[in-house]
Amino acid sequence: MPQNTRHTSIVEMLSTPPQLPNSTDLNSLSEQTDKNTEANKSDTESLHKSISKSSSSSSLSTLDNTEYSNNNGNSLSTLNSQNLLSVHRQEWQHTPLSNLVEQNKLIFIRGSISVEEAFNTLVKHQLTSLPVENFPGDMNCLTFDYNDLNAYLLLVLNRIKVSNDKITSDCQNGKSVPVGEIVKLTPKNPFYKLPETENLSTVIGILGSGVHRVAITNVEMTQIKGILSQRRLIKYLWENARSFPNLKPLLDSSLEELNIGVLNAARDKPTFKQSRVISIQGDEHLIMALHKMYVERISSIAVVDPQGNLIGNISVTDVKHVTRTSQYPLLHNTCRHFVSVILNLRGLETGKDSFPIFHVYPTSSLARTFAKLVATKSHRLWIVQPNDNQPTASSEKSSSPSPSTPPVTTLPSLASSYHSNTQSSRMANSPVLKSSDTSNNKINVNINLSGPSPSQPQSPSATMPPPQSPSNCPASPTPAHFEKEYRTGKLIGVVSLTDILSVLARKQTHHKEIDPQMARKQRGHIG
């Protein structure tokens, strides 16, 4: 029997920022830069030169979608972006916002279109948010994102109350609801706008306060040219980190040294510089996780076992997997079950069983945290304390972690729950949730609506109901494999994009007192 081999994941190998070209290329680049500077001194600050893809085999590359893979071969897709492949002569704070504009990803939608159309546009273009215009050229847009879709779903199911009775009635009676009305239901920060001539020194103070995205305009501030999100900025800084020597001391520091995240379970309350750890038990229903994310105004939630060990992650973007009536039983199944379903769906999309690593340790370096945030495309990572029988994470700052093999336990019974006729009717009537042929969202999850037959009880270790056909629903990850990858240690903290950006902001003299929770307070925390 051939021995199974485990390929080291790219996230494990990536402890340092992407390489810059070799010294010969840098010298050549510097000489050319000096010539250009003499020719046009007024452009010195923003001067940069794109690196040719063929200049060196060690050229800077962009990590667009890196996943932990358990099959023979790393799940890695590399996308080189012209805007990111550049070397800057100045410190990162002086980088103009024009360097980060991606006009091809700027897509507006009208406030009059339905939530269904808005959702399909998100999926079609693989975006996480869309500016909603009340009229062409609107400069004061609200944005539609998956938090709004989650609110819509909860409203359809009568899980939340809003002041607009007409919207409530239309949602629950299956009528089309304008997306412009739905985006008003979720508290949002002001629509910040900055001209493309501003630099990162300015925007870091805004994004570091918890604002998720900023509009980049032309110099006259009469036209929006792009949207700069927290995630995009983190990605840019990571992929150009070697061009910014002043980042190195921070990247080499551990989360514990930087005091990022809630690192002591005994603390009653986090400090103003820290995010609260919000989690849900794995045996609680998925609908409770979605409701908790809505109430807490968060975009992802940790899934833990009764002992507080991290076993998974649910993001608000995962709500796209429960937008059809055939997927309704997932809402009343467990969060643990849903995590296994998500992994299975990723396998359908990529052809590989994937296990994204959403955790770090207190001893993890900021560089490693950057790498994992970029690789998982997440807004936060969970900080865990390794189990006693796991290898210590003390080497994370300087070397790749060793794969751990904690004890394997079986999952509890995950029989599908029965659902009420009233809620089932609401799901069926919803314009978004009733569609089973949406061209841009064809995700099939075969669920036994009536639950297991009494004469044929489910296996205690099952993670998904038996598929109707092997061709349309491949087997989900086995319980052993699932537990092996996710039983990472006790959840003790969380580090978010906001936490990291606020640290960068506070390193500047004029942002010393920045509060990473400011924007969240403006949005209005509930509960």
UniProtKB/Swiss-Prot annotation:
Residues 21-31, 418-449 have a biased composition (Polar residues). GO terms for cellular component: cytoplasm; nucleus. Residues 32-48 have a biased composition (Basic and acidic residues). GO terms for biological process: cellular response to glucose starvation; regulation of mitotic metaphase/anaphase transition; septum digestion after cytokinesis. Residues 1-75, 385-481 are annotated as: Disordered. The modification Phosphoserine is found at residues 9, 42, 46, 430. It is found in: Cytoplasm; Nucleus. Residues 52-61, 391-417, 450-462 have a biased composition (Low complexity). The keyword Transferase does not apply. Residues 101-162, 185-243, 272-330, 335-391 form the CBS domain. It holds the Pfam family CBS. SUPFAM superfamilies: CBS-domain pair. Keywords: CBS domain, Cytoplasm, Nucleus, Phosphoprotein, Repeat. GO terms for molecular function: protein serine/threonine phosphatase inhibitor activity. Involved in DNA replication and cell separation during budding. Belongs to the SDS23 family. Present with 21200 molecules/cell in log phase SD medium. This is Protein SDS23.
